[in-house]
């Protein structure tokens, strides 16, 4: 961790670039190619980030001005679709976007501005179903005359009018894995607000302090990237990344989440009554926790907004209960309130939902950092994730196993289990004595974390799909016939 003295959450810079095949007219493997040609085509990549500058001006109260200027080049026909239409995401309830420039630059260097009819705002698809959590819009820019060798440039200013996390700034970025000629990230903060960074591949320039403010700058350049192997851990585990934060460590990060999550209405009589009704007749704490887990899992629809894309605090428990939907931190808040109502302790846990098995030395939100919340029950020594269907209480979905886990109440980094029990008893009987048709009978009994997956599969199946499942299992046994 590098402290600097005198994202914002998890955005991947330069847009989401479409992948493509190498240029069909490129030289065959092993053939020589002039150095200037190889550089100009991005080493076979369909798109090159020519220039990408992001400047953030942060105030003490969390208000923010962001200035972006980004130019992408289509190296071949496969890169045209990736740069011909670009997007600027913003939350219209919190932010204002001013488009400063939008133009196509042809191969001769002549700029062709985008007309007013090529710029429009559209509702982000995932926001349409959950307006309570986010009202995201995409400022869409459609560029004219894009062909192989041309570039598109977008420059905009985004102003955050309502700070999401007052007094805190954090930003996480990892490359989009397209060649980068030049990228600069600039953070202009009050001089008395230390900025901490975990930089891998990004070069930190000496900070400059003047007029009560400090300017931190990071530069990044990269040629063509190696192909990621199938089954590899997440790129953020070993690849380039930059995480900056005004919080020095995970204990401070946990305290900030803990303070923001305080809900005076968590012990509302309706919540307590529901918990007592659901656990009536159960004496053992584990049985009570299981009943509450099952109810939240079945009755609170999971709205998958990654932690860090919204204000890092759950909604009020009474609102979650009334709406019957919520994101991961809302699931944790409601489940925790129900547990507390029957005397069972719990605390939120922050971790990464994905194939990332380490966290940056600087705390932050993002795809390669923290982006999910689950629950820890210390008295039962169990983690629980109510957002995942088909996983019984006492077990975890594999996607959150063996991950660093930040316990919010204590501020301590722990780790979720690397393994969990599973078992299968299978018995097959084949009656081949009779003439003609051979009868086949199979008995399968699952135990452990996979058992509920099987139960859930058949529980949700229609009569027709049950027959289809049986026939599929017959084929998997290497037999031919009809179930």
Language-model segments: which ranges?
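Bacterial N-terminal signal peptides that target proteins for export
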Residues: 1-12
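Intrinsic disorder/low-complexity signature
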Residues: 2, 20-22, 152
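Bacterial N-terminal signal peptides
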Residues: 10-23
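Hydrophobic alpha-helical elements and their junctions with loops/disorder across both membrane
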Residues: 19-22, 109, 282, 296, ...
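Beta-strand-rich, non-transmembrane domain signature
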Residues: 25-250, 270-271, 315, 319, ...
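Secondary-structure boundary elements
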Residues: 250-323, 342
């Amino acid at each position: 961790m590098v402290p600097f003295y005198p994202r914002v959450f998890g955005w991947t810079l330069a847009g989401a670039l479409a992948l493509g095949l190498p240029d069909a007219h490129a030289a065959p493997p092993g053939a020589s190619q002039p150095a200037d040609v190889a550089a100009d085509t991005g080493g076979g990549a369909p798109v090159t980030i020519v220039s990408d500058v992001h400047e953030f001006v942060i105030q003490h109260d969390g208000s923010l001005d962001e200035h972006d200027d980004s130019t992408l080049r289509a190296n071949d026909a496969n890169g045209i679709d990736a740069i011909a239409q670009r997007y600027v995401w913003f939350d219209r309830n919190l932010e204002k976007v001013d488009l400063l420039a939008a133009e196509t630059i042809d191969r001769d260097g002549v700029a062709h501005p985008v007309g007013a009819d090529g710029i429009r705002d559209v509702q982000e698809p995932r926001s349409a179903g959950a307006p309570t959590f986010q009202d995201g819009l995409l400022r869409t820019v459609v560029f004219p005359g894009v062909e192989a060798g041309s570039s598109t440039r977008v420059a905009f200013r985004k102003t955050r009018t309502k700070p999401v996390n007052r007094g805190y700034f954090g930003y996480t970025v990892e490359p989009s894995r397209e060649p980068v000629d030049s990228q600069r990230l600039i953070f202009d903060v009050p001089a008395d607000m230390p900025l901490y960074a975990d930089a891998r591949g990004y070069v930190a320039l000496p900070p400059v302090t003047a007029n009560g403010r400090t300017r931190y700058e990071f530069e990044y350049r990269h040629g063509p990237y190696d192909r990621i192997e199938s089954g590899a851990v997440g790129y953020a585990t070993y690849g380039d990344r930059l995480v900056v934060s005004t919080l020095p460590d995970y204990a401070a990060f946990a305290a900030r989440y803990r303070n923001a999550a305080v809900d005076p209405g968590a012990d509302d009589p309706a919540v307590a009554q529901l918990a007592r009704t659901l656990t009536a007749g159960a004496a053992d704490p584990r049985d009570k926790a299981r009943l509450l887990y099952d109810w939240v899992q079945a009755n609170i629809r999971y709205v998958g907004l990654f932690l860090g894309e919204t204000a890092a605090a759950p909604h009020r428990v009474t609102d979650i209960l009334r709406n019957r939907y919520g994101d991961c931190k809302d699931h944790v808040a409601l489940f925790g309130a129900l547990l507390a109502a029957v005397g069972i302790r719990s605390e939120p846990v922050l971790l990464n939902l994905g194939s990332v098995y380490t966290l940056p030395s600087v705390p932050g939100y993002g795809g390669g950092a923290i982006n999910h919340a689950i629950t820890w029950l210390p008295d039962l020594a169990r983690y629980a994730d109510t957002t995942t269907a088909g996983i019984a209480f006492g077990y975890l979905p594999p996607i959150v196993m063996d991950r660093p886990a930040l316990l919010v109440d204590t501020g301590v980094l722990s780790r979720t289990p690397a393994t969990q029990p599973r078992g299968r008893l299978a018995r097959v009987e084949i009656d081949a004595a009779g003439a003609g048709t051979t009868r086949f009978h199979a008995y399968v009994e699952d135990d452990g974390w996979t058992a509920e997956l099987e139960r859930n599969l058949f529980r949700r199946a229609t009569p027709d799909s049950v027959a289809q499942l049986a026939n599929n299992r017959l084929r998997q046994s290497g037999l031919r016939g009809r179930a």
